[in-house]
Amino acid sequence: MSGLFSSVGRKGLFLIDPEKAHGLSVAALKSGFLPTCMVPHDPRLQQTVAGLVFPNPLGMAAGYDKNAEVPGPLLRLGFGFTEIGTVTPRAQSGNPKPRIFRLVEDEGVINRLGFNNEGHAAALERLTQARLRGIVGVNIGANKDSEDRIADYVQGIEAFYAVASYFTVNISSPNTPGLRDLQARESLAALLTAVLERRKTEAERLGKRIPIFLKIAPDLTEEGLDDVAEEALAHDLDGLIVSNTTLSREGLRPGPHRGEAGGLSGKPLFELSTTVLAKMRRRVGANLPIIGVGGVSSAETALEKVRAGADLVQLYSCMVYEGPGLPSAIVKGMSKLVAREGVETIRDLRDSAVDRWADRKLG
């Protein structure tokens, strides 16, 4: 599928507006047009993280399936888990179009979508009806015009508690004004306290404890990373997701869209996001789970995230360039790489490159 996509499908899709092309890809998944890409079960890739058993460590990041339209078809592409959202309490249209830009020269994407989604009710109805057996996380956010953003996150926990495999508290999108301010220490402490208190209430009501992850930006300073790490460890948080898109444009090749406002993802994000991942692993120690995101485009880059401290990895933007066969190719490639290393489990490779990445300077 990836080869066919590279030679034929990509050229056709790239003639279409990126947002329309995304809609077509979702429609193709919904219709069953794309074939299932089965990956062989490899016990060396299976991971138990935050109490959940992941068949393999590769997940679809939030942002692709905003409204929970295709979690099942995504899992059938070979992903070990998927994440819907970001969803906000009320539907919102996001920022004006155009708002997605391909950086073909760099195999990157700039987006300034602004949490466009159909709201809690629509996504909840789809997840409830789907009754999926796989791991499906719910990425929750706040409405742009919300007067109480912390309350929006609390509402997300309450709304999806019965159907979410895990939650991601997304406070790191650069496209909602002021959202990243919630990463400041006092604001973060208040947010985590409120969200985790709601989790406690829902756990008592429904008799199950759903893991909660915090998704952070790659643009934090060393001091900002200190604050996030200390608050994460001070609260009953289940893990971190590192990282969201970046505002940096360092290293981009000349191109028509490199100056567009928004968050940069894809291959250009790999080094920065992996550096921040390793710095966070060094700060939080060995026990707090971390999901590594940003620039994963191959089995080698996925495994490098693990070496830099990730328990699991996610991708999205690189599939724009490689096609729907990418997840199965990565999982199969990771199996071969782990076998070559001669280890019993991929976990044995985690942290082996933390120092090399964490010693890099930011900015």
Curated annotation (Swiss-Prot):
Q: Which Pfam families match?
A: DHO_dh
> How does the entry describe its membrane topology?
Peripheral membrane protein
The UniProt GO MF terms for this protein read:
dihydroorotate dehydrogenase (quinone) activity
Q: Which residues take part in binding FMN?
A: A62, G63, Y64, D65, K66, T86, N139, N170, K215, S243, G266, G295, Y316, S317
Record keywords: Oxidoreductase included?
Answer: yes
GO biological process terms, alphabetically, are:
'de novo' pyrimidine nucleobase biosynthetic process; 'de novo' UMP biosynthetic process
From the UniProt annotation, give the residues forming the signal peptide: none
Explain the purpose of this protein. Answer: Catalyzes the conversion of dihydroorotate to orotate with quinone as electron acceptor.
Q: What is this protein called?
A: Dihydroorotate dehydrogenase (quinone)
